[in-house]
Design a protein with these regions (language model features):
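Acidic, polar-rich low-complexity tracts and alpha-helical solenoid repeat scaffolds
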Residues: 1-310
């Protein structure tokens, strides 16, 4: 009966019937091979693609009911992490965190534990729970990590510190990290603490050579350039404003931020309060396009924490 249900894609009834059979008849000669078949069916549902056709909640419900069938080793870990990714995509962050928390506690060790712990920390940050993010990192410390994974964990720890109100410690945590991800985090910290003189050079690094190849600026590039000139304006960094105007004066006119760019980089004697008003106007936009959002974007093209696997 269980196999018939499975053949009809009724996975819950099928696995339920097979579970009853092996539970009620533990000494039957068919129990051992049937148990292996049940475990394989569970694996195939979640790895072979059938679970992808379910809603994330239905997939989670099926997993929770038959969790004991999760294979040991990498295939089982793959099931858990894939399900967690799907839950994150629909903002079921608490449920995703619980899955990975169990994985950290009971399934993985060493560098793999550190990697999954970083994923768990990221979910907690996305869920606005920085203390839990720090706890996840502390619970998954392991020696001998690769440089990429160690740096990613460091950035997550810095983000959690900042979200808990300790901007200085967060900046110290990443002071040796020269990566773009670290600069995005620095820019966000300086922006939100209104440390304009410190923000401007970081945004300038992030802007880099955008638009110098003759291509038009997309909205994201234009916003990054605007954040640079807002920071430079608020810190009265005329050198940076002149550089930005010379480099991007023409190309920024064709973007939604052209008027703001013109005000920030122009030679007029506008009231400084206009600059402050504009900076506040774009503050929330600047924050959205920052550290955590870059991770959310990566969910669309790969598994959660893809940047923490090195």
């Amino acid at each position: 009966l269980g196999l018939l249900y499975l053949a009809e894609q009724d996975f819950e009834e099928g696995l339920g019937a097979l579970k009853q059979a092996v539970t009620y008849f533990p000494k039957n000669p068919q129990t051992a091979p049937l148990t292996r078949r049940m475990t394989k069916a569970f694996h195939d549902i979640f790895v072979g693609g059938a679970a992808a056709d379910m809603t994330p909640l239905n997939a989670l419900g099926l997993y929770d009911r038959f969790r004991e069938l999760t294979p040991v080793g990498k295939s089982g870990d793959q099931i858990i992490e894939s399900l967690a990714d799907r839950l994150v995509e629909v903002d079921l962050l608490d449920r995703a965190a619980l899955l990975l928390q169990r994985q950290v506690r009971f399934r993985v060790k060493g560098a793999e534990k550190a990697r999954v712990g970083a994923r768990l920390a990221l979910i907690n940050l996305l869920n606005r729970r920085p203390p839990e993010a720090l706890a996840a990192l502390d619970a998954s410390v392991a020696p001998g990590l690769g440089a990429g994974l160690a740096a990613a964990r460091n950035r997550l720890r810095a983000r959690a510190m900042f979200e808990m109100g300790d901007a200085n410690s967060a900046l110290v945590q990443i002071n040796r990290d020269k990566s773009r991800d670290a600069d995005e985090l620095r820019a966000d910290i300086h922006w939100r603490t209104q440390s304009w003189a410190q923000a401007a050079p970081v945004f300038e690094r992030l802007v880099g050579k955008l638009g110098t190849d003759g291509r038009s600026l997309d909205d994201e590039a234009a916003l990054l350039i605007l954040n640079w000139v807002v920071s430079a304006s608020m810190s009265e960094d005329r050198r940076s404003l002149a550089k930005a105007r010379q480099r991007y004066g023409k190309s920024m006119r064709a973007t939604p931020y052209g008027e703001a760019f013109e005000l920030m980089t122009g030679d007029s004697n506008d009231d400084p309060l206009d600059f402050l008003s504009l900076s506040r106007r774009f503050e929330e936009i600047g924050r959205v396009k920052s550290f955590l959002t870059s991770y959310r974007e990566k969910l669309k093209v790969g598994p959660l924490g893809a940047t923490t696997t090195q």
